[in-house]
Amino acid sequence: MADTKKNDNYAIDMDKLDAESDRFRPPPQPQPRHSSSSHSQSISNSPVLPILSYCASSILMTVTNKYVLSGVQFNLNFFLLCVQSVVCIIAIQTCKSMGLINYRDFNSDEAKKWFPISLLLIGMIYTGTKALKFLSIPVYTIFKNLTIILIAYGEVLWFGGSVTGMALFSFGLMVLSSVIAAWADIKHALDTSGFSGAEATSKISTLNAGYIWMLINCLCTSTYILGMRKRIKLTNFKDFDTMFYNNLLSIPILMIGSFIVEDWSSENINKNFPIETRNSLIFAMIFSGLSSVFISYTSAWCVRVTSSTTYSMVGALNKLPIALSGLIFFGDPVTVPSVSAIVVGFISGIVYSLAKVKQNAKPRTGVLPTTNPVSASTQSMRDGLKS
């Protein structure tokens, strides 16, 4: 402290001497102006633009997928995912050739190691599209929070992780918001059907299918993320390396799955792509593929300009506009229970993010269960995952 204080006083004295000696110096030479470049650099380093870009790309991705899947007759889910993967590969390869991004070239040994992760990714995205087809965007977003619980306890079992009391409280809020959302959905289905037998049964069965797909999606998502953590440790992949291998290895599987499972008759194609909306649907499919690239870029931009803590908070706050987008663009029912579920789910995300911040600051305070010390590499991998 004494040395620091001496240095501070010395700095102040030198500033005074410099100020007094300015009058004996010749006038400074005019410097060339770089107003435009400095202005653009200040904008790119401002935290506002990357945060807004990340939120916008997340909303666009969800809304475009819902727009494609909301068609009554749409059932080509494997084809949709294949188009998105192809668009993503073309986009990032173009960016790499232009020198905007960089990632590893294809390696067969790395592809073999990463192939199981690509299978899990296909399962995660496919079940997500099926759930989004049957459920509204707010309900889908709320139930997606349950994945956080599975990942947290998966870390406890596989990586020596821990769950704090505050995180446990946020998990309770997540479960509560999911129960409220399901109750609101079922109540609205019964009210709109007038409690008539056939129509009510049809709507309830549709919701039940959505809940089942959502449960499978939560399991696939948590398994994918936990498995990816272990594989990244082996391959040392970066963000764009992961994106490249995930999409490239997924394309042949999705193509085979689409040709084997899905109906490619002319009648079914006309049902999936009606003439009056065909162009807009194709554009939405391509745009959703580009949105995945935007999300990866803007998330990395957000972490670089701000911090991983700010990024995790933005991810929690972003659930609110995503849920509201369903109410705005798709006419999802606006009722007291549905809005309450959104609010509780939003609060649970905030509480969980704060719990992670406190846990990283004081990792041994109020931790459940008690864990043994872990290695630095394991701790860094744990901190790198921001659910």
Curated annotation (Swiss-Prot):
Record field: compositional bias (Polar residues): 368-381
Biased amino acid composition, Low complexity: 32-45
Coarse class of the protein's main subcellular location: Golgi
Record bears the keyword Isomerase: no
Cytoplasmic topological domain residue ranges: 1-42, 93-112, 154-162, 228-241, 302-309, 356-387
Matches recorded under Pfam families: EamA (PF00892)
Lumenal side, ranges: 64-71, 130-136, 185-206, 263-280, 330-332
Entry keyword set: Cytoplasmic vesicle, Endoplasmic reticulum, Golgi apparatus, Membrane, Sugar transport, Transmembrane, Transmembrane helix, Transport
Subcellular location: Golgi apparatus membrane; Cytoplasmic vesicle membrane; Endoplasmic reticulum membrane
Function noted in UniProt: Involved in the import of GDP-mannose from the cytoplasm into the Golgi lumen.
Subunit structure: Homooligomer.
Protein name, as recorded: GDP-mannose transporter
Source organism per UniProt: Coccidioides immitis (strain RS) (Valley fever fungus)
